[in-house]
A protein has these predicted regions:
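RNA-contacting regions in translation and RNA-metabolism proteins
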Residues: 1-227
């Protein structure tokens, strides 16, 4: 009986250590992209397994609205949170986080990975539209061109991964007027009055440019404001 009790205690301790290992492993992976396989799809969340068989959760609200996955599909997502629930590691993934888009750019654009180009800000309405502000520390590198690639070669893969999310890459600048002008692209701006005290800007443009500035469903102006 004492041998059996010892064996049970040992098994429980090993299981506990394994859980701690998974927790610590993923705690270090927060903000990183992982590849997994869809194991189960429920109404409110999806169960994903990594290559070691660890269970990861992708909640519905962290999925792009047009995402459609079935059991056995490969899936790419970013780790956003790791918790312990009832002594079990609970690893939460996201495909809607701006960090996911940032990491996709790092994977596709060597200049970002190497630190020659910095992503200053990312704002997105998942599956619809995103704006990414980038800056280069080397005058010889065009940060926007490097991110888009020849004939869009670098950005196409990212757009596909994000279910055809429309991505605007803009050149970051400390010049507020120029930054606002670029953020509101493709609308052509005539004049900008900046109210520093209230952190507001009045933007003037020709009547035919207004709908472009606002964008479909107000997305362009919403994202420009967030940027």
């Amino acid at each position: 009986r004492s041998v059996l009790a010892l064996r049970q205690n040992l098994s429980a301790r090993i299981l506990e250590l394994e859980k701690d290992n998974v927790y610590n492993k993923y705690k270090d992976k927060v903000g990183q992209i992982i590849l997994g396989e869809v194991y189960q799809v429920w109404k409110k969340e999806m169960l994903v397994l990594d290559d070691e068989g660890n269970e990861l959760i992708l909640p519905k609200q962290e999925q792009i609205p047009t995402d459609f996955f079935k059991k056995g599909d490969s899936i790419k997502a970013v780790v956003i949170r790791v918790e312990m629930r009832n002594s079990n590691p609970y690893i939460i993934l996201s495909r809607t986080s701006p960090v996911f888009l940032e990491r996709l750019f790092e994977n596709e654009v060597p200049e970002i990975f190497d630190g020659l180009i910095t992503i200053k800000n990312v704002v997105r309405v998942p599956g619809e539209r995103a704006k990414v502000a980038v800056e280069s520390y080397d005058d010889r590198i065009d940060p926007v061109g490097a991110c888009v690639g020849m004939k869009g070669s670098r950005i196409h893969g990212i757009v596909r991964e994000l279910r055809n999310e429309n991505i605007d890459v803009i050149n970051y600048t400390n010049n507020l007027q120029l930054y606002i002008t670029r953020a509101l692209n493709p609308a052509k701006i005539k004049n900008i009055e900046i109210d520093e005290a209230h952190k507001k800007a009045n933007v003037y443009l020709d009547p035919e440019e207004v709908s472009l500035a606002i964008g479909k469903g107000g997305l362009n102006i919403k994202l420009a404001s967030q940027l």
